């Protein structure tokens, strides 16, 4: 029978519930348990797909095409279980499902209310995510409840998990509550009052925490832990300190050494072998003992919030570990990059242009791609980063001076990038759209496969077939591929059915490492193996760094104005 651990948060948001949940899952997995994680988001959006990265951060995409919370990226990087659509749901999805049932007459004329109809639906969604009472059932499902205790939006979720705990019994559920213990510099002490109050709020809802994870910028002394225990009704051994660390990969060991996994296993009556965290210790050692350092310039549209590129940042660091190098990322707002100042990128060992939507800042990205191409700096373009590299090549090499994307200029005479109107989805169904289609849920999403051209750089990295996750509406225009090929661009991966361009590159006798991919490889990177594309990119960056050092960092070419 599946056991459930519910993780809630209090006082303030962004305490690290996702990292705490993923860390607990990793420890339990190391004990031999089959574990999954489920994220409940209390906003009314159906999914985060149409939300601004500045508001929500990264949208993480699963193999089955779900646009989900960035915490699912942490989950996949910490445990072996892959996330699915069922592992993340929102208030919007719950109400949509309830209202559809009401319209069908499933409630047999009853008045539809938050209790029991909405709360029952939440419980059904949780069980579905855990594969409850199916062949796919897990041993433990860790359920992260988004938001903060006391928020109106979270109340139906908290009531639902309270009911679920009551129905399933005390040995089948456990509650872990994160709270904030601030350090008041003027007083020179940690203050426990906010944690006392949030534990009280939780009890008023009907939930008694089994474990309190106390977030602070330092370890919490025994005296404060004893006080928190007394006023929160949690035994002192259940009051666990979570302090700031320089890498999130230290958190599993931190929680294990304070007995969190033992407490949960005792509460849930789980008889398991001891935890084995050697792989985590090895990982931390690798992060703390790099042999060299590389500097990457990331030219993006959402750089004011680094969470917009969370998986990408982690993928670069994973590749750094595989190459025994510390990766230092410097962010550049693409709106600030112009032909006059792009030469400031010359001091970097590699240039990366990530994905994005809309015309803002696109010309700066095109400048960055051109600068990398002309100065033979290793370049990796992801999604929009591939598209701007294609536009740049079309303008300055293929002679299509007005080349553009119809996303940025619908009337462009040379639409080398255009809207995809038909494609096969991750589940095999044929999807269509046009310029008037809704924004939400109408992109090419999820895992897609394509053939890789033999003899290409991509083939050295991926082999014969590449399968990666996608999230885009626009694609290289098939009508321009021959012209681009004749000018020297290598189209190294195409989908079999639609002939959509998946990877472009420059021949290695022209540029040592210049690759653009339409997909998002960062979503499949793990700290254990990295990702083959990022591993190859950082290896090329290291090689460029060595060569540039030997050549004395030759002066970069300035960009010439193009009429």
From Swiss-Prot:
The record's section on InterPro entries has: Class_I_gatase-like (IPR029062), CTP_synthase (IPR004468), CTP_synthase_N (IPR017456), GATASE (IPR017926), GATase1_CTP_Synthase (IPR033828), P-loop_NTPase (IPR027417)
Q: Which residues form the active site?
A: 383, 520, 522
Q: How is the activity of this protein regulated?
A: Allosterically activated by GTP, when glutamine is the substrate; GTP has no effect on the reaction when ammonia is the substrate. The allosteric effector GTP functions by stabilizing the protein conformation that binds the tetrahedral intermediate(s) formed during glutamine hydrolysis. Inhibited by the product CTP, via allosteric rather than competitive inhibition.
Give GO MF terms, alphabetically: ATP binding; CTP synthase activity; glutaminase activity; identical protein binding; metal ion binding
Q: One biological-process term from Gene Ontology? A: 'de novo' CTP biosynthetic process
- Respond yes or no to whether keyword Metal-binding is given for this record: yes
State what this protein does.
Catalyzes the ATP-dependent amination of UTP to CTP with either L-glutamine or ammonia as the source of nitrogen. Regulates intracellular CTP levels through interactions with the four ribonucleotide triphosphates.
- Entry protein name: CTP synthase
Q: Give the originating organism.
A: Polaromonas sp. (strain JS666 / ATCC BAA-500)
């Amino acid at each position: 029978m599946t056991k459930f651990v519910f993780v809630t948060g209090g006082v303030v948001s962004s305490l690290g519930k996702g990292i705490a949940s993923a860390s607990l899952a990793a420890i339990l997995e190391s004990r031999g348990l089959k574990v999954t994680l489920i994220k409940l988001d209390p906003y009314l959006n159906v999914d985060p797909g149409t939300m601004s990265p500045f508001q929500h951060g990264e949208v993480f995409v699963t193999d089955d095409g779900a646009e989900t919370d960035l915490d699912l990226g942490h989950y996949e990087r910490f445990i072996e279980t892959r996330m699915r659509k069922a592992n993340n749901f929102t208030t919007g999805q719950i109400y949509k499902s309830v209202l559809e049932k009401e319209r069908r007459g499933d409630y047999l004329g009853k008045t539809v209310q938050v209790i029991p109809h909405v709360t029952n639906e939440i419980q059904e969604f949780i069980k579905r995510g855990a594969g409850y009472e199916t062949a796919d059932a897990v041993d433990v499902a860790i359920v992260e409840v988004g938001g903060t205790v006391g928020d109106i939006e979270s109340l139906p979720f908290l009531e639902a998990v309270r009911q679920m705990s009551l129905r399933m019994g005390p040995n089948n559920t456990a509650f872990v509550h994160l709270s904030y213990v601030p350090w008041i510099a003027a007083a020179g002490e940690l203050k426990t009052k906010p944690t006392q109050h949030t534990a009280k709020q939780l009890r008023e809802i009907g939930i008694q925490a089994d474990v309190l994870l106390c977030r602070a910028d330092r370890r919490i002394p025994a005296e404060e832990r004893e006080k928190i225990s007394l006023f929160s009704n949690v035994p002192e051994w259940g009051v666990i300190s979570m302090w700031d660390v320089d890498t999130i990969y230290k958190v599993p060991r931190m929680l294990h050494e304070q007995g969190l996994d033992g407490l949960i296993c005792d509460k849930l009556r789980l008889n398991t072998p001891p935890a084995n965290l050697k792989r985590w210790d090895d990982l931390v050692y690798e992060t703390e003992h790099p042999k060299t350092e590389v500097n990457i310039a990331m030219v993006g549209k959402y750089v004011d919030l680094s969470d917009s590129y969370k998986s990408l940042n982690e993928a670069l660091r994973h590749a750094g570990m595989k190459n025994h190098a510390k990766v230092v990322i410097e962010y550049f707002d693409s709106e600030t990059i112009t032909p006059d100042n792009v030469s400031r990128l010359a001091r970097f060992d590699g240039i990366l242009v990530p994905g994005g939507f809309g015309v803002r800042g696109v010309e700066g990205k095109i400048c960055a791609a051109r600068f990398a191409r002309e100065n033979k700096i290793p370049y990796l373009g992801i999604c929009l980063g591939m598209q701007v590299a294609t536009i740049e090549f079309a303008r300055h090499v293929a002679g299509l001076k007005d080349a553009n994307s119809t996303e940025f200029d619908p009337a462009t005479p040379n639409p080398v990038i255009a809207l995809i109107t038909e494609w096969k989805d991750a589940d095999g169904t044929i999807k269509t759209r046009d310029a008037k289609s809704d924004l939400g849920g109408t992109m090419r999403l999820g895992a897609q496969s394509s053939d890789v051209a033999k003899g290409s750089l991509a083939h050295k990295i991926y082999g014969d077939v590449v399968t990666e996750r996608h999230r885009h509406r626009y694609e290289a225009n098939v009508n321009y591929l021959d012209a681009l090929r004749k000018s020297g661009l290598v189209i190294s991966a195409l989908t079999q059915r639609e002939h959509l361009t998946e990877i472009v590159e420059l021949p290695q006798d022209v540029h040592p490492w210049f690759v653009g991919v339409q997909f998002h490889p960062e979503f499949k990177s793990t700290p254990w193996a990295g990702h083959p594309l990022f591993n190859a990119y950082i290896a090329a960056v290291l090689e460029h760094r060595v060569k540039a050092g030997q050549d004395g960092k030759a002066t970069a070419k300035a960009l010439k104005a193009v009429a």
